[in-house]
Amino acid sequence: MKNYHDIVLALAGVCQSAKLVHQLATESRADSETFLTALNSLFITQPQRIEDVFGGEVRHLKLGLETLIHQLNAQGDQNLTRYWLSLLALEGKLSKNPDAKQTLGNRISRLKEQEIHYARDSEIMLSIMANIYSDIISPLGKKIHILGSPDYLRQELVQNKIRAVLLAGIRSAVLWKQMGGTKWQILFFRRKLLATAKQIYSSIY
């Protein structure tokens, strides 16, 4: 039997990354706590439970749950829809590419070693995360076209933040697949996903 609670949490993680990308592209900034939650998820590779990936508490996925609920209600921004569905598609490509998976694992291991020297949200670490996305994930499929302010999107720091958040989105997409998530559920069990997302969201308050 599918654990829709965990499937929804992982999918909320994907949607949260999509929302952060939108914020960065249109405003050049994102909610700091939510941004850190995304980055931190890259360092949690052996969680005891799914909440551990997102700071141990469901409240850290509040923005992602809000976004997911809007998306499942067909009230969401079309760009956000494209972002999170593209992340799921890229995860599908990654799962079928053993070499890319191994390289990604090795690069994430080296990333974790760097936090001895640098803060996770430092410009150096963001650059490393962005390079991992560009080197391994981006070549797997169609590149995600990000829409926003050209002035912001030209800034290297904003570019690196966006790619780092996209990498975190891939982390959540991998988790979603591991929890039993499928695209068929999004098509045929939308009401079940929506009801579960609303139930989890209501528990935050």
Swiss-Prot record:
Keywords: Cell inner membrane, Cell membrane, Cytoplasm, Membrane. HAMAP family: HflD_protein (MF_00695). Transmembrane segments: none annotated. This is High frequency lysogenization protein HflD homolog. Coiled coil: none annotated. It is a peripheral membrane protein. It comes from Haemophilus influenzae (strain PittGG). Gene3D superfamilies: HflD-like. It is found in: Cytoplasm; Cell inner membrane. The keyword Cell inner membrane applies. GO terms for cellular component: cytoplasm; plasma membrane. It comes from the Bacteria.
